[in-house]
A protein has these predicted regions:
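Sec-dependent bacterial lipoprotein signal peptides
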Residues: 1-12
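Secretory-pathway/luminal and periplasmic proteins that interact with or process carbohydrate-rich
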Residues: 51-56, 71-73, 142-153
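Short alpha-helical hairpin
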Residues: 65-89, 166
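Short coil/linker segments at helix-helix boundaries
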Residues: 126, 149-187
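Glycine-rich, acidic and aromatic/proline-enriched surface loops and short helix-turn segments
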Residues: 149, 191-194
């Protein structure tokens, strides 16, 4: 009985707050950017995403070539075969191009939502402008990749056909924006690159 009494008293005295543990690997979006060093670290993370095999270290590079008629995938079972044969479904297709580019855009939007609120000294103004310029350029670059990959060529109809959604604010996974026209996409790209 004594053991059971101790067990009951120990479990009854515990609260549920031990279950509310903050993540040690994630930073809340609202407080992610506190200074220019945080911006630089975040940009390094974006560049790291860009060099993954799902983006510029692989699929983004060869997809355009192997789906055309100027190259050929000669061995079956290789990573280019399904693209070459156009043998994929809507669920197994080139979704990594979409998700990685929008991951870059989302991270850029997080930086841009907070960077103007930073207290920047006069000595750091050039550094600030460089970091903000890189962020805008990366967002525009990712939108350019998406537009040329998933949109109809601008020259075919003057950009009137559908391109991809333009996302310029921090969004959550439930946000499902509608597609913009190719012309609107290129306007947004040029705006980011100016």
């Amino acid at each position: 009985y004594m053991m059971m009494g101790m067990l009951v008293s120990l479990t009854a005295s515990c609260g549920n707050d031990w279950l509310d543990v903050e993540s040690s690997t994630k930073i809340p979006t609202e407080t992610a950017i506190q200074n220019l060093d945080d911006v630089e670290y975040s940009l390094n993370g974006i560049y790291d995403v860009m060099r993954s095999t799902n983006y510029y270290s692989g699929r983004m590079i060869y997809y355009g070539d192997v789906t055309g008629d100027d190259t050929q995938s000669i061995k079956t079972g290789k990573r280019t075969t399904s693209y070459y044969m156009l043998d994929y479904t809507k669920d197994s297709g080139p979704s990594s191009h979409w998700s990685y580019a929008y991951k870059i855009i989302q991270n850029c939007n997080i930086i841009l939502s907070q960077i103007d609120g930073l207290d920047v000294s006069e000595d750091d103004t050039e550094y600030f402008n460089d970091l903000k310029g890189q962020t805008l350029a990366l967002r525009g670059f990712a939108l350019f990749d998406l537009t040329r990959f998933f949109g109809y060529p601008y020259a075919k109809d003057g950009g009137a056909s559908l391109g991809v959604p333009i996302v310029t604010e921090v969004s959550n996974t439930e946000n499902k924006p509608s597609r913009n026209t190719v012309a609107q996409c290129y306007e947004a790209i040029i705006k980011d690159l100016k």
